[in-house]
Amino acid sequence: MGAQLRVYRQKIKSAHRTKKITRAMELISASRIQKEQARVAASSPYARAITRAVSAVATYSNVGHVLTTEPEKIERAVIVIFSSDRGLAGAFNSNVLKESEKLAELLRSQGKEVVYFLIGRKAQGYFSFRRRAFERVWTGNTDAPEFEQAKEVADAILESFLRDSADGGVDEIHVIYNRFVSMLTQEPQVVRLLPMEVVEGVEEPDRTQVLPLYEFEPDVNTVLDSLLPVYIESRIFNAMLQSAASKHAATQKAMKAASDNADKLITDYTRLANNARQAEITQQISEIVGGADALSSAN
């Protein structure tokens, strides 16, 4: 009985220690998410504005630019997966990885070769464990993304897209990340980044509305050459920020659930320890009474 009581007390201490850790991680994530939410709110209007600008130029110029024109045959497609460097975030990483598997299966069914660009150690570990090849990987800044890394990713995407297919170039770019909706909801988002869908961000004009007349200096291709890299950089950076905010929200939610589970374990083991202690006391009293009866009988 005493050994069982010691086991329960050890488990209670262990649950208390675990609760301290999960509670601290919950508070850290809560403090970080405020900053990442502000960064998402600051970057999203610019990303939408640059998307509308590029879409408008491509739509109203009637010029076939390489980054906005659908190729006749798509042979290779890149999937850029945004994961985190650390775990303890519930289904945050598994959701984007599941979406990547679905998208890869769809692309392969269309006869396309799939190439992976990975962001975050969790995606890297997922592919390395399964011994699956990936082209590029970036790690280290997923909790607090910096624009320099977003620019590096965007440059790699553009370089692969503009490279000839015979030299290992790609014809299509897709990105998969968790979009921050609220503290309780983070949705996996699948977006085709290139070739750009020019309808995105441009509303259909009313039939009675006079269409805008654009003039481009020095010419349309030069304007698009300047705008599209900025567009890719802003979209990649916004996806990084959305992913970071979603990760902190998922971590806070997971750690809150872990703290609640620790509380429940403490309550359950405390009740079991009390029962064991009561049984031990009852047994001791019974032994004392039995011994006293034996002595009185002997006398």
From Swiss-Prot:
Any GO MF annotation of the entry: ATP binding
Keywords tagged on the record: ATP synthesis, Cell membrane, CF(1), Hydrogen ion transport, Ion transport, Membrane, Transport
Subcellular location, in the record's words?
Cell membrane
Q: Does the keyword Cell membrane apply?
A: yes
**Which residue spans traverse the membrane?**
none
Q: How does it sit in the membrane?
A: Peripheral membrane protein
Main location, first listed in the record: membrane
Q: Which GO terms describe its biological process?
A: proton motive force-driven plasma membrane ATP synthesis
Which InterPro entries does this UniProt record tie to the protein?
ATP_synth_F1_ATPase_gsu (IPR035968), ATP_synth_F1_gsu (IPR000131)
Q: Which GO terms describe its cellular component?
A: plasma membrane; proton-transporting ATP synthase complex
Give the Gene3D superfamilies listed for this entry: 3.40.1380.10, ATP synthase, gamma subunit, helix hairpin domain (1.10.287.80)
Q: Name one Pfam family in it.
A: ATP-synt
Answer whether the UniProt record assigns the keyword Cell membrane to this protein.
yes
Q: What does this protein do?
A: Produces ATP from ADP in the presence of a proton gradient across the membrane. The gamma chain is believed to be important in regulating ATPase activity and the flow of protons through the CF(0) complex.
Q: Which NCBIfam families match?
A: ATPsyn_F1gamma, PRK05621.1-2
Its subunit composition reads: F-type ATPases have 2 components, CF(1) - the catalytic core - and CF(0) - the membrane proton channel. CF(1) has five subunits: alpha(3), beta(3), gamma(1), delta(1), epsilon(1). CF(0) has three main subunits: a, b and c.
HAMAP family found in the cross-reference section: ATP_synth_gamma_bact
Family per similarity comment: Belongs to the ATPase gamma chain family.
Q: What is this protein called?
A: ATP synthase gamma chain
* Organism classification: Bacteria, Bacillati, Actinomycetota, Actinomycetes, Micrococcales
Gene name of the record: atpG
